[in-house]
């Protein structure tokens, strides 16, 4: 199958196009922090010439503890998204968890994300598909790469072919994730754009007493490996103070390192996509 191109305004999302950054913060902690982080991303990506989509969640519905911070909720979250979009002229991506969220969220954001833990929930898939919005499907930690075809088929049969596939690691025993680089390449064979969530792939699920741990010190190494595959995009989360982030701080890139980090990712992407393809199957 040839590479599918998804058009998001002037941005082309495809495996053989320059990579698109899907980046921001894990969860909306406050309006002011979200605006500040969005401004930093916007400035850095514009400087480096990287197509960019702002990401944040309005509700983290799958936290380890019932007492953990979840976010401002949909109504307040959409107000913040609207302000970010208007102020910085950025396209937006966020996740939904329930059927009733799909339509109102799709009115504000440009891409809606299907969470990994919910990727087989047919009612949610159908509701997302019917919005006509671009969909980012997080590959569940418990599915093989080739099994993503079933989720793709559900979206297709519900009337939506604007699909991005996102790798975020696979379960490896207890409290651990690994990234199968060949698995990402296998997903690319579908023709749909594949992006790499290099933040959540660093998780240690349940690695803390009441929250997920992570391996922030290896954020660059893992992302470099993924970018060497020639992907449609990179998905990352950053925070000005990761140790005090309200969610997934152990995986978050320190915001002050964003520019140097992205310089390396762009250099790898440019190099890999300058090569002629090699068909080693023959």
From Swiss-Prot:
Q: Name one GO biological process term.
A: keto-3-deoxy-D-manno-octulosonic acid biosynthetic process
As given in the record, the signal peptide range reads: none
Enzyme class, first EC level, given as a word? transferase
Q: Which reaction does it catalyse?
A: D-arabinose 5-phosphate + phosphoenolpyruvate + H2O = 3-deoxy-alpha-D-manno-2-octulosonate-8-phosphate + phosphate
Against InterPro entries, the record matches this protein to: Aldolase_TIM, DAHP1/KDSA, KDO8P_synthase
Is-annotated flag, keyword Iron?
no
Pathway field of the UniProt record reads: Carbohydrate biosynthesis; 3-deoxy-D-manno-octulosonate biosynthesis; 3-deoxy-D-manno-octulosonate from D-ribulose 5-phosphate: step 2/3; Bacterial outer membrane biogenesis; lipopolysaccharide biosynthesis
EC number of this enzyme: 2.5.1.55
Q: What keywords would UniProt list here?
A: Cytoplasm, Lipopolysaccharide biosynthesis, Transferase
Q: Which GO terms describe its molecular function?
A: 3-deoxy-8-phosphooctulonate synthase activity
Family matches, as NCBIfam families:
KDO8P_synth, PRK05198.1, PRK12457.1
HAMAP family attached here? KDO8P_synth (MF_00056)
Name used for this protein in its record:
2-dehydro-3-deoxyphosphooctonate aldolase
Native source species: Shewanella baltica (strain OS185)
Gene this protein is translated from = kdsA
